[in-house]
Amino acid sequence: MSNEQEDFGSLFNNQGELGIMDDFAEFGFQTTTTPTNWAAAGNYMYPDQVHLPASINNPNMPINDWLEDAPMPDCYNVPSTSTDENNDPFPFSNISSQSSLKPKTPEKAVVEVRPTGNEMLDPEPKYPKEEKPWCTIFYYELTVRLGKAFEAKVPTITIDGATGASDECRMSLTSQPSSRNSKSSQIRNTVGAGIQLAYENGELWLTVLTDQIVFVQCPFLNQTLNKPLKYVFRLQNKGDQKRMKIFDKEQFEQEKTLALGPLTEKEVADERMRIFSNIRVSFCKGFGETYSRLKVVNLPCWIEIILHEPADEYDTVFRINNERPEIGSRS
């Protein structure tokens, strides 16, 4: 018999039962024959220096009683759950039989984690991000702003005079409060299909759908066409006159470059950028130098469109220009 076999054989007593090594005596344990049901350990090697309570060898105390008051692991520490369900000190002794352990899980999972390909697991729940509006529209009668602001979050919207409440794709002028001005009410009732705004790939297009004439004041468009910033366009639902591009991001980037350029150019570009985010549309009634009403605030029914992207860009440019040191002088 080899030395290895002799060492392994010394673990058993004369009856072939697994005994406790003499090395345990220094820990205050009695070296006596263990219960016969431990023989089911088979070829499992006994762990070195295992701290076993002396009560485990007491023939008058069941082997399971010594763990009766032992704290359970956190994953099984469920209120009103008996610790007897997990009290076997050496679970491998019953490896051949099906375990009676029935761990309890919460009734509702707080976070559900699922693998997503090669990406790392993210334990935080994900919620769809709220889509930001690309423009805000206000309704006016003369100088009075009425109703709630309309925020456009979908690429294409309409502003019309049809009945019914507004929704994410449509702003209804008839659903807005009225200033009780008879002219305003009359115009609102004739707006009909109104206008359409379509914003895609950095371009904003306005299309006339109503049979009425629409007047548009767009400083950015006037700048690109070398017209006075207060110039007013007259559109109607006929041929080429019904559709017009009123904003272009690429053109706007060029103006932003000027605003960040030398001081002499920056002073002019700053003022222009400030109004490039504003578009004013009047229904039925015109205004401007060729009309009796010079300003849009003299009209009974009109809307103001605020484009968020150029407005945010202006805020950024304005902050940068005010933070950096200026070279030159203002006169």
Curated annotation (Swiss-Prot):
The highest taxon in the source lineage is Eukaryota
- Which GO biological process entries does UniProt record here? anatomical structure morphogenesis; BMP signaling pathway; cell differentiation; dauer larval development; determination of adult lifespan; egg-laying behavior; negative regulation of dauer larval development; pigment accumulation
Q: Name one GO cellular component term.
A: heteromeric SMAD protein complex
Q: Which SUPFAM superfamilies match?
A: SMAD/FHA domain
Keyword terms, alphabetized: Transcription, Transcription regulation
Protein name per the record: Smad-related protein daf-14
| Complexes and interactors | Interacts with R-SMAD daf-8 and co-SMAD daf-3. Interacts with daf-3 in a daf-8 dependent manner.
Pfam families (alphabetical) = MH2
Instruction: Show where the MH2 domain sits.
Output: 134-331
Chain intervals with Low complexity compositional bias: 175-185
Which PROSITE patterns does the record associate with it?
MH2 (PS51076)
Function noted in UniProt: Probably an atypical receptor-regulated SMAD (R-SMAD) that is an intracellular signal transducer and transcriptional modulator activated by TGF-beta-like daf-7 signaling. Plays a role in TGF-beta-like daf-7 signaling in regulating entry into a developmentally arrested larval state known as dauer, in response to harsh environmental conditions; partially redundant with R-SMAD daf-8.
Residue ranges, annotated region (Disordered): 168-187
Organism whose genome encodes this protein: Caenorhabditis elegans
Q: Which GO terms describe its molecular function?
A: DNA-binding transcription factor activity, RNA polymerase II-specific; I-SMAD binding; RNA polymerase II cis-regulatory region sequence-specific DNA binding
